[in-house]
C-alpha cells in the first residue's frame, strides 16, 4: 500500500467534503457511437487491458492508502440491449444513463476505478460508455487506455508489451533526491509569492446550492479552416495554440466578470522521466498550475497572450511543488479557504494532435460525448483537437452557476475565437480599460458584512422593496428604465465584495424581469404574486451586476403589478424615492452631477473633534433599548421582516404639526419626539438610544452617502416639551459632527455594550422625499425595508395629499406582531391626542391600553371569611374528637387542642396580655407552637414567630425591634424582654373561654412576620386579619378544602406560607400533620408522613417540594390531590415530573411578597405551562400593576416593577416598635385614581390574556430556596470581617429553572492574614441566617469591574459558575460511595443523584465527618441533605 499523491488526496477528500463545490468524484465520462461492436472481442480486450494497466483496479483503504485489487475485481463489460424498443424510449433510457454516469462515484474502496458498458441499438449501432476515476486514470492516461483497448480489440492475438506500473513510477518520484530538492526550491519560490497571487474569478455562485451536484456541458466545434487559421496565427505571434486560446478565454472571462486580476487553474500532465516507458503508463500524473491573469498589464489580447505564455512558463518551471499543496498554503496564508474554481484544459499541442487516434475511432466510433467532474471546480473549459477542427467542450456545475450567465460567457468566448480566426487583427484591438474603482465607505462595508449570517439579525441586505399596481405600457416602462440606467451611474454601479471596492460599469444592463400572468383569472394571478412577494422582498440582489431589480407582472386587461428592489449599497432612501418617481411618472429632477470621486479635504482634525463630541454625548447610553424582545438580540438569527402601517389623515396631521410649531419644533422633530415618548413605554429599564439616518445635501449623482446619528431619549429628564426641545438640539448638533460616522458610533457603542446589536431601533425621516401624485397611474401598494442588525425601522413620510404615512418594518424573530400593533395604535392615539387638545403634552393614562388589568378586582370583591370564628367553634365545641393535629406519636383532637389554647388564653390574660399587645413565639414546630399562635390570634394579641435557628445576634434584633410584651420560650433563659416558657402557660387548667369576638375582619395589627430588608436588618411586616381572611376564605373555596383533607406543615413557621397551613387547615376542620422534633428537614420522613396519614394538600416553597420528591423512594405520594408551590421560581421540569407521577393532582403556583399577606396572586398550572410557569392572576380584592421607573403603567409584554394594591396590603413595617411606610406608596391606577400600593422588589410583565409573568428581581433581592434574600445585606455583613477589603455577592445559576445559588467574590486586605475558607464560612454562619450563607466563596485579586467602573456582576457569575475540578468532585463522590458501601469500578458519574445510590439521612453524619477530614470544611448533615450530587457538595466546600 502506498500513500496517495497530492492530487489523489485532494480528489479523495473532495468526494465527501462539505466545502463549496465538493461532494463529487473527479472522473471523466465519455461516449463513443460505433457500429457492429463485437462484445466478446471487447470483453477479451478489456480483460487484457486490465492486466496491462493495474490502475483500473485501484483500491483505497480506510486509512487512505492505495493498492491494487486482484483481477477478480477487474472491470467487467456491462451490456444494455435496447434493440426492439421504440426510438423515444431508447432516447430516454440513453439520457437517463448519461445523467447517472455523469454524476456517479466509482467504488474505489472495492477496486472499481473504471466502468465500461455497451448499449446495443437497432441497425447494429452501439454506444460505448466509459467512465474513469481520475484518482486512478487522469485525462492523459485515458488516451493511453483507449488506445490500448482499441489495439487489443483490433488484434486480440497480437503481443503487447507490458508497460511499467504507475506505482513503480510513483516510488521513483518519492525516492529521487534531485526531485525532492527541486520540490523544496519550488515551494520556497511559491511561498515568496503568496501575497501576490491573484484572487479567484468573481463568479455569480448561487446563494443556495442543492445537496446534489448537477453537471452539464456546453460544446461546439470550430471547423478545420478555423483550426488552421488559429494555428497559423499562433505561429506568427510566437505562442502555442494552447496559449492563444488561453488568452482568448481569459479575455472573455474578464469581460464577463468585470475582474481585472484573477487566477486560473491550468492542468498539466507532465510525467517525470524517472523510468523507461513512462509515456505508456496509465495512472495519475495531473498537476495544476495556478496561473495569474492581469488584464490591466496587457493593452490588447496579443499582449495578454504573451503575458500568459511567460506566466505559464514560470509556473511550469516551478511545478515540482504540487499546485494542490500551493492552494492549501494559500488558504492558510489568508485564513480562509481559497479556491481555483475555473479550469482551462488545453489538449491542442499533444502528440498525435487528435484527442483520440483513428484506431480508437475505427474500433468504437467517433467521440459523441465527453464530460468531467472535479471537486471545487465550477467550470472546466476544455479545448482539444478533434476531427480536424477544435472541440470546445465546457463542463459546468449548474448547481453552482446560473445557466444563463455561463451560457453568455461560452458564447462570448466562441464568438471571440471565431472572430480572431476570421480577423487576426482582433488580437491587436485594445482591451477595455478598467473602470475607476473606489473603496467602499464604512457604511457600505457594514452592509456587506450584514449580508453574512455571522452576526445577529444578519443574512439580509439593507434594501428597500416597493410594490406598485396600475396601468402602464410595458414599452414605456422599459424605455424609461433603459434611459435611467444610462443616465444614472448608480444603476450601473457594481460592488466587488471580495476586494471591497465599487465601480461604474459601462454596460447598460436592465435588471428587468417580466412575468406574464395575463392568461390567468385575476384572483389566481394575484395569488401567484402573493406567493412570490416575501421571497422577492428578502432576496439578496446578486453582486455580479448592479444590485437592483424590477419585476413586472402582466395581468389581464393591461394591468401591471411591479416589484422593485433597490440595495442601499448604491442608493439611499431619498435617491430611491426620486428614481421611482422618475420611473413611474417620467418626472426628472435636475440632472445630478457625476461624482468624480475626487479626494476630499483632510478631515483628521474634524474627525478627532467629532469623536470627542460623541464620546461625551454617548456616555449616558446604557446599551441597546430593553424592549420586549422575543429572544435576546445577541442570540437572534437570520432576520425576516414584516411591515405594519398607520395613516394619519391630513387635517389631523396638520393640527399636530401646528402644535409642534408653537413649541418652535420642526415637523420631523415633533413627530420623532412623540415616537420616542410613546416607544419609551415599551422600554423595561434604561434609556432609549436610536439611530437616525441623515444624508448631507448633495448635487452629485445619486448614491448612498448617508450616515446616521445616535439619539438618546431619556424619559426621566425634564418634561415632555423639554425633552422634545433637547431632541431638536441633539439632531442639529449631530449634523455638525458627521466626520465621526454612524459606523464609528455603532462600533463605539458595541465596544461598550456588546455583544449583540447596539442600535436595533431606527427612525427614518422621509418628509423630504419625492412622492408620486395622488392620481398616479401606478399606485404604491406597500413595501418593506430591511437593515442588518436592525430590529425595528420606524419610517414616516407624507403622501401627495398631505396625510402622514407611518411604516414600521420589524424583524419578526425578535418582535411580536401584536406588540408592534399595540405600539402603532398607541402612537396614533398620541398624535390624535395632541392634535385634538391643541397642547404639546401627553397623558399616558389615556394612551396605554390597560385591558391586561382586567383580572384585577376592587377591594370590595375580597372574601369576608370568618375564619377565626370557625376555628374557635371547632376548638371549643364540646366533644369534637375530630383529629386536629398529629405530631409524632401525639394525636390531638380539636377538643384537646382547644384545651391547650384555652389554658394559654387564661395564662396570657393572667399576665395582663390582651388585644393589641405583642407576644414573640420562640418555639420549634410543635403542637405548643400552634396552641400559642391560635390563642393570640383568637384574643387579638399580636403574635410574632421568631426563627429559633437564627444566629443569636439576629434573634436579639428580632426581639428588640418588635417590642414584645412577652417572649415565650421552649426553655427558660434570661432575656431583656419579659419571658416565660410555653410549659408554664400550659400548666394551669382552664375552662374554654367565654364569648370571643370574631376578629377575622379586624384591620388592626394581627401578627408580625420578619422578611429580608435592604437596610442590613430584616424588615418586620405588620399584617392584619382582614387580609388574612381574604386569603384563607378565597383559597379554601378555590381549592375546595373540606374536613376530610390532611395538611402537612413543613414550611418554617416564621415564613408567611405557614400561616395558611395552620389557619387554613383548622378553619376547614381538617387535620394538620406536624413533623416531630428532628424531622423538620428530613425529606424521607416527610414521605413517610404523607403515606402514613394520607396527606391530601401540600403547600411549600419549591425547594422543599423538591426535597420531598428527591427522597420519594418507594412512596408514590398518591394521596396528594393538590400541590401548591410559591415564594420562588417553579421549575418546569419539576412540574413535568409531577404530571407524570400524579396526573390527577391539581398543581398551583402561588406568589406575592410577605407585604401582601401569605399570597396574593395565583395560577393553576395547566398542560400548556411547560417552559415558564406564570405568576398568575390576583386573588379577589387585589390588583397588580406593572409600572416603569416613572410610575407609568407598562403595556402588555413590557417588563416593569410590580406594585400591588387592594385588600391584602400589609399595614406597613415595624421599626423599633413604630409603624413605618417605606415601600408602601401612592400610585395612580389605570383610571388615574390615587391608591395605596406596595412597591415590590419584583419585575414582571403581562400577557395579552391578563396573566402576569414573573421576570426578575430588583434592588439586590433574590429568592434562594424560597427565601427572599438581600444581596447588599450579605455584602455588608461579610465586609465587616477584618481580613476582607471588598466583597461582591451575586446569585448565579439559572433562576428561571430554580437553580439559584449565592456566591461571594472577596478581596483580602493585604495587611491582614488571609483567612481560610473554613474560617470565612464559619463567620458567615455566625453572622447570617442559614438561607443567606453563600454557597461558594471565591477569593480574587480584584473585583471584576465593568467599563463604567461598576461591579461587573455578569463576570462575577461567570467566575462562580466555572466548572468545578473533576478531582474534587471525584473525591467527594468516593466518600459517599465508601459510606454507602459501593465501589466505583463502574465509573459512577459525579452528577449522579445520591438518592439513586441509596443515600439516607442517617448516612450523612459519617459523610460530614469524612468531608471535614478530607477538606477541612465542617458541613452539617442538614446542609448535606440539600445536596443532590457531588457537584453540589463541591459548591458547599467553596
Swiss-Prot record:
Q: Which Gene3D superfamilies match?
A: 3.30.300.30, Chloramphenicol acetyltransferase-like domain (3.30.559.10), N-terminal domain of ligase-like (3.40.50.12780), Nonribosomal peptide synthetase, condensation domain (3.30.559.30)
* Gene Ontology cellular component annotations, sorted alphabetically: cytoplasm
Location of region: Condensation 1 (Cy1): 3-427
Q: Where is this region: Condensation 2 (Cy2)?
A: 460-695
Gene that this polypeptide is encoded by:
pmsD
Name of the protein: Pseudomonine synthase PmsD
Decide whether keyword Cytoplasm is in the record: no
Keywords (alphabetical) are: Hydrolase, Ligase, Multifunctional enzyme, Repeat, Transferase
Annotated EC: 3.3.2.-, 2.3.1.-, 6.2.1.70
Native organism is Pseudomonas entomophila (strain L48)
Gene Ontology terms, MF aspect: acyl carrier activity; hydrolase activity; ligase activity; phosphopantetheine binding; transferase activity
One Pfam family hit: Condensation
Amino acid at each position: 500500500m502506498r500513500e496517495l499523491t497530492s492530487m489523489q488526496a485532494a480528489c479523495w477528500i473532495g468526494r465527501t467534503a462539505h466545502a463549496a463545490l465538493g461532494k463529487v468524484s473527479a472522473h471523466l465520462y465519455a461516449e463513443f457511437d460505433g457500429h457492429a461492436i463485437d462484445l466478446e472481442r471487447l470483453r477479451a480486450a478489456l480483460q487484457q487491458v486490465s492486466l496491462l494497466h493495474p490502475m483500473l483496479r485501484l483500491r483505497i483503504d480506510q486509512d487512505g492508502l492505495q493498492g491494487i485489487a486482484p483481477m477478480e475485481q477487474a472491470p467487467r463489460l456491462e451490456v444494455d440491449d435496447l434493440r426492439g424498443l421504440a426510438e423515444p424510449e431508447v432516447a430516454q433510457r440513453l439520457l437517463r444513463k448519461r445523467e447517472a454516469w455523469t454524476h456517479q462515484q466509482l467504488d474505489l474502496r472495492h477496486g472499481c476505478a473504471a466502468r465500461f458498458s455497451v448499449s446495443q441499438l437497432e441497425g447494429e449501432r452501439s454506444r460505448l460508455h466509459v467512465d474513469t476515476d481520475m484518482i486512478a486514470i487522469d485525462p492523459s492516461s485515458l488516451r493511453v487506455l483507449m488506445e490500448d483497448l482499441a489495439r487489443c480489440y483490433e488484434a486480440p492475438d497480437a503481443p503487447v508489451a507490458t508497460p511499467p506500473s504507475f506505482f513503480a513510477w510513483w516510488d521513483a518520484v518519492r525516492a529521487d533526491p534531485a526531485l525532492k530538492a527541486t520540490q523544496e526550491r519550488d515551494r520556497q519560490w511559491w511561498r515568496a509569492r503568496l501575497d501576490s497571487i491573484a484572487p479567484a474569478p468573481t463568479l455569480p455562485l448561487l446563494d443556495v446550492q442543492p445537496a446534489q451536484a448537477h453537471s452539464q456541458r456546453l460544446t461546439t466545434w470550430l471547423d478545420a479552416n478555423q483550426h488552421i487559421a488559429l494555428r497559423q496565427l499562433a505561429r506568427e505571434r510566437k505562442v502555442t495554440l494552447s496559449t492563444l486560446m488561453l488568452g482568448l478565454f481569459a479575455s472573455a472571462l474578464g469581460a464577463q466578470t468585470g475582474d481585472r486580476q484573477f487566477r486560473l487553474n491550468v492542468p498539466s500532465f507532465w510525467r517525470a522521466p524517472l523510468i523507461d516507458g513512462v509515456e505508456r503508463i496509465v495512472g495519475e500524473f495531473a498537476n495544476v498550475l495556478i496561473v495569474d491573469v492581469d488584464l490591466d498589464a496587457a493593452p490588447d489580447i496579443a499582449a495578454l497572450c504573451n503575458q500568459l505564455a511567460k506566466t505559464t512558463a514560470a509556473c511550469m518551471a516551478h511545478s515540482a511543488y504540487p499546485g494542490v499543496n500551493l492552494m492549501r498554503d494559500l488558504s492558510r496564508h489568508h485564513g480562509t479557504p481559497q479556491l481555483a474554481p475555473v479550469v482551462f484544459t488545453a489538449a491542442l499541442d499533444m502528440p498525435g494532435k487528435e484527442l483520440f487516434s483513428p484506431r480508437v475511432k475505427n474500433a468504437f466510433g467517433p467521440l459523441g460525448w465527453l464530460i468531467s467532474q472535479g471537486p471545487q471546480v465550477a467550470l472546466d473549459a476544455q479545448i482539444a483537437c478533434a476531427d480536424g477542427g477544435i472541440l470546445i467542450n465546457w463542463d459546468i456545475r449548474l448547481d453552482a452557476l446560473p445557466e444563463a450567465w455561463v451560457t453568455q460567457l461560452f458564447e462570448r468566448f466562441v464568438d471571440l475565437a471565431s472572430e480572431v480566426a476570421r480577423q487576426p487583427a482582433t488580437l491587436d484591438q485594445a482591451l477595455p480599460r478598467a473602470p475607476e474603482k473606489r473603496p467602499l465607505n464604512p457604511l457600505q462595508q457594514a452592509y456587506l458584512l450584514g449580508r453574512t449570517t455571522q452576526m445577529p439579525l444578519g443574512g439580509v441586505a439593507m434594501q428597500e422593496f416597493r410594490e406598485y399596481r396600475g396601468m402602464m405600457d410595458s414599452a414605456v416602462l422599459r424605455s424609461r428604465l433603459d434611459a435611467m440606467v444610462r443616465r444614472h451611474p448608480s444603476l450601473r454601479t457594481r460592488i466587488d465584495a471580495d476586494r471591497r471596492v465599487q465601480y461604474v460599469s459601462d454596460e447598460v444592463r436592465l435588471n428587468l424581469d417580466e412575468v406574464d400572468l395575463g392568461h390567468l383569472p385575476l384572483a389566481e394571478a394575484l395569488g401567484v404574486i402573493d406567493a412570490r412577494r416575501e421571497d422577492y422582498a428578502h432576496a439578496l440582489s446578486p453582486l455580479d451586476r448592479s444590485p437592483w431589480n424590477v419585476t413586472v407582472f402582466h395581468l389581464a386587461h393591461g394591468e401591471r403589478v411591479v416589484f422593485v428592489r433597490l440595495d442601499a449599497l448604491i442608493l439611499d432612501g431619498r435617491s430611491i424615492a426620486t428614481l421611482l418617481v422618475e420611473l413611474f411618472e417620467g418626472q426628472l429632477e435636475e440632472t445630478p452631477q457625476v461624482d468624480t470621486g475626487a479626494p476630499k479635504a483632510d478631515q483628521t482634525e474634524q474627525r478627532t473633534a467629532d469623536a470627542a463630541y460623541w464620546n461625551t454625548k454617548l456616555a449616558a447610553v446604557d446599551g441597546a433599548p430593553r424592549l420586549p424582545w422575543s429572544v435576546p438580540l445577541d442570540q437572534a438569527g437570520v432576520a425576516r421582516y414584516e411591515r405594519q402601517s398607520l395613516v394619519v389623515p391630513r387635517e389631523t396631521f396638520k393640527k399636530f404639526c401646528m402644535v409642534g410649531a408653537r413649541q418652535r419644533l420642526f415637523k420631523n422633530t415633533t413627530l420623532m419626539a412623540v415616537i420616542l415618548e410613546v416607544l419609551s413605554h415599551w422600554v423595561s429599564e434604561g434609556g432609549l438610544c436610536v439611530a437616525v439616518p441623515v444624508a448631507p445635501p448633495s448635487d452629485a449623482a445619486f448614491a448612498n452617502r448617508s450616515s446616521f446619528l445616535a439619539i438618546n431619549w431619556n424619559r426621566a429628564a425634564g418634561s415632555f416639551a423639554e425633552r422634545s426641545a433637547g431632541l431638536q438640539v441633539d439632531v442639529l448638533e449631530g449634523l455638525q459632527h458627521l466626520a465621526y460616522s454612524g459606523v464609528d458610533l455603532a462600533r463605539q457603542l458595541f465596544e461598550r455594550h456588546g455583544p449583540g446589536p447596539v442600535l436595533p431601533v431606527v427612525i427614518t425621516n422621509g418628509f423630504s422625499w419625492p412622492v408620486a401624485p395622488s392620481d398616479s397611474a401606478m399606485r404604491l401598494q406597500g413595501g418593506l425595508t430591511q437593515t442588518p442588525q436592525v430590529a425595528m425601522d420606524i419610517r414616516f413620510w407624507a403622501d401627495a395629499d398631505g396625510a402622514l404615512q407611518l411604516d414600521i418594518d420589524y424583524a419578526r424573530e425578535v418582535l411580536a406582531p401584536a406588540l408592534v400593533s399595540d405600539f402603532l395604535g398607541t402612537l396614533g392615539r398620541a398624535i390624535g391626542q395632541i392634535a385634538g387638545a391643541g397642547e404639546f403634552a401627553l397623558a399616558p393614562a389615556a394612551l396605554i391600553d390597560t385591558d391586561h388589568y382586567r383580572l384585577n378586582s376592587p377591594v370590595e370583591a375580597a372574601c369576608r371569611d370568618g375564619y377565626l370564628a370557625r376555628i374557635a367553634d371547632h376548638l371549643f365545641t364540646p366533644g369534637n374528637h375530630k383529629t386536629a393535629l398529629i405530631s409524632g406519636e401525639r394525636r390531638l383532637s380539636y377538643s384537646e387542642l382547644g384545651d391547650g389554647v384555652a389554658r394559654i388564653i387564661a395564662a396570657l390574660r393572667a399576665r395582663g396580655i390582651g388585644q393589641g399587645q405583642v407576644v414573640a413565639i420562640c418555639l420549634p414546630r410543635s403542637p405548643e407552637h400552634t396552641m400559642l399562635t391560635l390563642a393570640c390570634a383568637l384574643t387579638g394579641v399580636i403574635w410574632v414567630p421568631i426563627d429559633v435557628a437564627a444566629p443569636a445576634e439576629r434573634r436579639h434584633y428580632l426581639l428588640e425591634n418588635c417590642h414584645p410584651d412577652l417572649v415565650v420560650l421552649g426553655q427558660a433563659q434570661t432575656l431583656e424582654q419579659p419571658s416565660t416558657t410555653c410549659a408554664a402557660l400550659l400548666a394551669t387548667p382552664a375552662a374554654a373561654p367565654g364569648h370571643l369576638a370574631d376578629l377575622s375582619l379586624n384591620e388592626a395589627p394581627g401578627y408580625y412576620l420578619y422578611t429580608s430588608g435592604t437596610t442590613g436588618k430584616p424588615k418586620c411586616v405588620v399584617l392584619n386579619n382582614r387580609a388574612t381572611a381574604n386569603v384563607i376564605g378565597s383559597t379554601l373555596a378555590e381549592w375546595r378544602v373540606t374536613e376530610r383533607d390532611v395538611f402537612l406543615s413543613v414550611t418554617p413557621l416564621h415564613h408567611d406560607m405557614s400561616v395558611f397551613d395552620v389557619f387554613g387547615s383548622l378553619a376547614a376542620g381538617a387535620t394538620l400533620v406536624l413533623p416531630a422534633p428532628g424531622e423538620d428537614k428530613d425529606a424521607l420522613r416527610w414521605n413517610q408522613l404523607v403515606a402514613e396519614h394520607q396527606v391530601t394538600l401540600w403547600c411549600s416553597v419549591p425547594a422543599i417540594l423538591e426535597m420531598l420528591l428527591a427522597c420519594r423512594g418507594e412512596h408514590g405520594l398518591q394521596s396528594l390531590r393538590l400541590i401548591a408551590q410559591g415564594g420562588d421560581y417553579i421549575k418546569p421540569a419539576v412540574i413535568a415530573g409531577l404530571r407524570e407521577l400524579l396526573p390527577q393532582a391539581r398543581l398551583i403556583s402561588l406568589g406575592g411578597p410577605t407585604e401582601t399577606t401569605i399570597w396574593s396572586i395565583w395560577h393553576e398550572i395547566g398542560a400548556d405551562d411547560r417552559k415558564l410557569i406564570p405568576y398568575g392572576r390576583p386573588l379577589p380584592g387585589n390588583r397588580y400593576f406593572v409600572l416603569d421607573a416613572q410610575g407609568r403603567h407598562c403595556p402588555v409584554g413590557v417588563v416593569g416593577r410590580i406594585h400591588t394594591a387592594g385588600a391584602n396590603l400589609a399595614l406597613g413595617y415595624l421599626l423599633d416598635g413604630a409603624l413605618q411606610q417605606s415601600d408602601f406608596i401612592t400610585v395612580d391606577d389605570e383610571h388615574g385614581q390615587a391608591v395605596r400600593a406596595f412597591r415590590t422588589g419584583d419585575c414582571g410583565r403581562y400577557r395579552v390574556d391578563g396573566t402576569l409573568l414573573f421576570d426578575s428581581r430588583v434592588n439586590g433581592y433574590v429568592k434562594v430556596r424560597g427565601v427572599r434574600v438581600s444581596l447588599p445585606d450579605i455584602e455588608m455583613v461579610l465586609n465587616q470581617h477584618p481580613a476582607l477589603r471588598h466583597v461582591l455577592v451575586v446569585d448565579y445559576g439559572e433562576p428561571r429553572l430554580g437553580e439559584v445559588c449565592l456566591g461571594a467574590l472577596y478581596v483580602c486586605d493585604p495587611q491582614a492574614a488571609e483567612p481560610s475558607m473554613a474560617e470565612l464560612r464559619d463567620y458567615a454562619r455566625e453572622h447570617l441566617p442559614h438561607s443567606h450563607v453563600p454557597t461558594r466563596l471565591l477569593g480574587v485579586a480584584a473585583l471584576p469591574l465593568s467599563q463604567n467602573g461598576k461591579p461587573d456582576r455578569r463576570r462575577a457569575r461567570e467566575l462562580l459558575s466555572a466548572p468545578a475540578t473533576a478531582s474534587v468532585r471525584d473525591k467527594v463522590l468516593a466518600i459517599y460511595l465508601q459510606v454507602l458501601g459501593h465501589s466505583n469500578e463502574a465509573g459512577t458519574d459525579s452528577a449522579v443523584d445520591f438518592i439513586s445510590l441509596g443515600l439516607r439521612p442517617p448516612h450523612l453524619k459519617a459523610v460530614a465527618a469524612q468531608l471535614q477530614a478530607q477538606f477541612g470544611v465542617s458541613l452539617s448533615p442538614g446542609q448535606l441533605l440539600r445536596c443532590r450530587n457531588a457537584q453540589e457538595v463541591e459548591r458547599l466546600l467553596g
